[in-house]
Amino acid sequence: MSMSPRPPFPSFIPESAPFTPEQRTWLNGLFAGVFGLQEGVTPLSPADAAKLLPGLLDAGAAPATTPTEADDGAPWHDPAMPMPDRMKLADGRPLPRRMMAAMAQQDCGQCGYNCKDYADKLFDKSEKRLNLCVPGGKETSRMLKQLYAELDGGASAPAVEIAEEPKRVAYSPPGRSRDNPVYATFLSRQRLNKEGSEKETWHIEIDLAESGLDYEVGDSFGIFPANAPSLVEGVLEALGAPGDFPIGDRTLREVLTDGVSLSPAPDMLFQLVSYITGGERKAKAKALAEGKDPDGDAASLDVLAALHKFPGLRMDPEAFIEALDPLQPRVYSISSSLKSSPGRVTLTVDAVRYEVDKRMRYGVCSTFLGGRCSPGDRLRVYVQKAHGFALPADPAKPVIMIGPGTGIAPFRAFLHERQAIKAPGRNWLFFGHQRSNHDFFYEEELTAMRASGHLTRLTLAWSRDANEKIYVQHRMREVGRDIWAWLNDGAHVYVCGDAQRMAKDVETALVDIVAQHGGCTPAQAKDFVADLKAKGRYQADVY
């Protein structure tokens, strides 16, 4: 059978473009590779490409990298690592990886992506919002602003500008992303702490009938909150503007309630203040806009505190609103299973309340759910699919779940799911909090599961019951031999909770357990845990 000759590469580069024939051939081959490389064609090496395009690398563009060089496991992808350390590890890497390093590394989904995908979207300019990383806050948005500038003429700007192809906006079904929320109905809340607790934690129930949403255990639930009315009124008073001032087709009060963030004051607000004031106040506002801290109070300046810091200004309400960040949704781990609670979703939420300079501050969504919502209220919501946080495909596999505080949320869902499907695998839960008499979340449920044998083991840690603080990682070390035995039986390990301390300490404890009871060196133990991660047998949902 005769074979037809291989067709040439299609022409992506117009003949009028300022390239030599060799350069045009190479670029056409490059784009052919991007859009589907023809069978049997070997791409040029970076060295050969540099010979064809000698001016490209000389003009400051980063050299091409192999897939292995571009994706080296992201050593900065550690939520406990400070920003300067992450950026140092990413130094010299391609710009998208440095953008990734600037993020909070939690893969929490509040931005609508995981960290790597958000960075990639910023790099290709299909996403232009630099303030979506809620846990990273102003520190992340400032660093992203610096890095994003490189796309438009900085050190990593391309030497040759090629017209951008119009970006396609990915469609997401209703309720499947922050950009396309649906409505669900608030049903109830129940306090999980007993009287005398220093914490305020709520079990929240939401009806999904109107939304038509479903979810899997391990997923998270996004909610668009509203700012506290007292805070909104305080801002209106400090601004000296009427609440019914028109902002587009809404009022100023409405926009302040659910349209903009009144939490940490953004740099743009201080920049606006610097434009309309003078003298020392202008200098301070300009310094704050540049990320400096002239009076040592920058960390405590929410929008109302910023207005109080510069009293007497009469800002145009529209300009004021333009200077604020949009109010972001908040994402919570789902603590229920549709198989045991059809048509409903439950959340486990710590209400955040604290005082700064004799004024109460409130967690915008936690106190919205934990105090201001009433049964029947309609909420804008969406399901955030899990990024590699799910039960084993084999229900016979044992699972070890480590979730102190609200970190218990996904594991309550796991337990209900495994109970509903009659999974034969063993279940071991580590839970901890401050005091056993006040902070034992879901005590009756867990006690019943333990009595029935569904919860094979329940290990508890209380940090305030004795003089010595006991945390889950301490309990892990006490039963390290048994953990090692479960691992040898194929157990999957899950961690949920605080990224800065707990998750790091738990991983350290697990490495030590492997070294001690597995009879290996610390380096080998680290490799063992890394292998668990690579195989999906060690998964974390941290915040």
Each model region followed by its residue ranges:
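FNR-like FAD-binding dehydrogenase module
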Residues: 2-19, 29, 35-80, 146-543
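Predominant activation on well-ordered alpha-helical scaffold segments within soluble catalytic domains
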Residues: 24, 28, 96, 100, ...
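Short, charged low-complexity linear segments at domain edges
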Residues: 76-97, 139-146
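C-terminal accessory/binding modules appended to enzymatic or scaffolding proteins
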Residues: 88-98, 102-107, 178-179, 184-187
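Amphipathic alpha-helical packing elements
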Residues: 98-106, 110, 118-121, 215-216, ...
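Local cysteine-cluster metal-coordination motifs and their immediate loop/turn environment
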Residues: 103-121, 130-146
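Glycine-rich phosphate/diphosphate-binding loops and the adjacent beta-loop-alpha structural elements
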Residues: 127
